[in-house]
């Protein structure tokens, strides 16, 4: 950034330099990246800060640099005014966070531009998957957890259940399925971007629920990957959720095929008291040295493999090929169908569309199964001394 600012100063006739940043701010100033940026590059006049979803009611000021942020998901508009001082730098003279509500009239010209862009979503993107944005995939009468619930409430959530189940369904029902069953599918909370309201669930809503990333094919949307982990590593994955995700809530894991119980009162890295496979009909004990097929999205696979470094070696996950060789490039294990990447959001859309039409109107219905949870992640809140020390892992 410093080099870019110097280049601008040398080659351009500018009054103000604004940085649009996806680094974010934190309460701990030493870890607040956009504040560190303001200190390191004092020639920046204004930093529009994103990533951490922070609503700054007042700007953060370091020297002559202002850091501002208006929250998340277009809920607010940030409005500010600045006046140039005699030395050429700028002083903020007004700053306001304006909630975006239905009381605000749409700007017709802007809405028209948006509508034109939305038309290209169908023709330039969704057509290659056989969808249109307004296409109804399923009708829903289930109260799903919110995206925030997945991060803030440390327990099983039906939103995580349906997404992880969708991965298994899509892989095992793909046109060129290799016949190897999926043992476990994993969805971290940090990859989920929205929930499903009651009523019609459309393609647009499913895409919005898992809209992150891009594949090796250059097409938007993270693809699914297939890796292998040992039984011991699957136990470690459960411990990551139980112990690590309280410090990094985006690492809360929602699984299909892997059930576990944890006690939040036990020692860190020793909170999981029971973990096993569940094929839908029976409990299957994990074998520490056996390899199990695991499906996740590309980003999550890369993130989970970094756990060893993040935990200073205390927790180790090494995703592998079917022969046990460690994976070096996760793009090698992207799941494809007829030569095209199987995107995570498309997997969810396919699963939604596969549900039984229970009311006879020609549209699938989200099953009652998802109206409750199913012992995939159980919380044992006991403080009994026996429960606090039993089954050390």
Regions found by a protein language model. Name each.
Residues 71-393:
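Catalytic centers of hydrolytic enzymes
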């Amino acid at each position: 950034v410093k080099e870019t600012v110097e280049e601008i100063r040398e080659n351009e006739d500018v009054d103000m330099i604004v940085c649009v940043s996806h680094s974010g701010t934190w309460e701990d100033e030493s870890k607040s990246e956009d504040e560190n940026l303001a200190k390191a590059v004092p020639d920046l006049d204004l930093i529009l800060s994103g990533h951490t979803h922070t609503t700054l009611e007042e700007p953060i000021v370091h020297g002559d640099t202002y850091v501002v942020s208006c929250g998340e998901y277009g809920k607010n508009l940030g409005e500010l005014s600045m006046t140039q001082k005699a030395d050429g730098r700028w002083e903020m003279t007004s700053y306001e966070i304006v909630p975006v509500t239905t009381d605000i009239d749409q700007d017709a010209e802007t809405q028209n531009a948006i509508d034109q862009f939305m038309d290209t979503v169908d023709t330039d993107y969704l057509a290659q998957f056989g969808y249109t944005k307004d296409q109804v995939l399923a009708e829903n009468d289930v109260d799903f957890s919110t995206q925030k619930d997945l991060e803030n409430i440390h327990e099983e959530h039906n939103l995580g259940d349906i997404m992880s189940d969708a991965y298994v369904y899509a892989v095992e029902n793909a046109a060129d399925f290799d016949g190897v069953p999926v043992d476990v599918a994993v969805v971290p909370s940090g990859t989920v971007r929205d929930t499903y309201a009651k009523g019609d669930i459309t393609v647009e809503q499913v895409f919005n629920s898992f809209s992150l990333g891009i594949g090796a094919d250059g097409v938007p949307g993270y693809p699914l990957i297939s890796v292998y982990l040992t039984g011991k590593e699957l136990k470690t994955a459960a411990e990551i959720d139980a112990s690590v995700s309280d410090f990094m809530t985006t690492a809360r894991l929602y699984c299909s095929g892997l059930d576990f119980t944890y006690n939040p009162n036990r020692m860190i890295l020793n909170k999981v008291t029971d973990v096993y496979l569940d094929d839908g009909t029976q409990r299957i004990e994990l074998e520490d040295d056996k390899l199990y097929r695991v499906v996740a999205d590309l980003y999550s696979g890369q993130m989970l493999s970094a756990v060893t470094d993040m935990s200073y070696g205390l927790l180790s996950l090494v995703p592998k090929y079917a022969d046990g060789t460690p994976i070096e490039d996760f793009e090698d294990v992207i799941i494809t169908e007829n030569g095209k990447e199987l995107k995570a959001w498309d997997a969810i859309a396919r699963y939604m569309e596969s549900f039984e039409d229970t009311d006879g109107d020609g549209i699938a219905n989200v099953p009652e199964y998802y109206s409750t949870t199913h012992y995939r992640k159980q919380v044992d809140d006991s403080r009994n001394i026996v429960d606090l020390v039993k089954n050390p892992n």
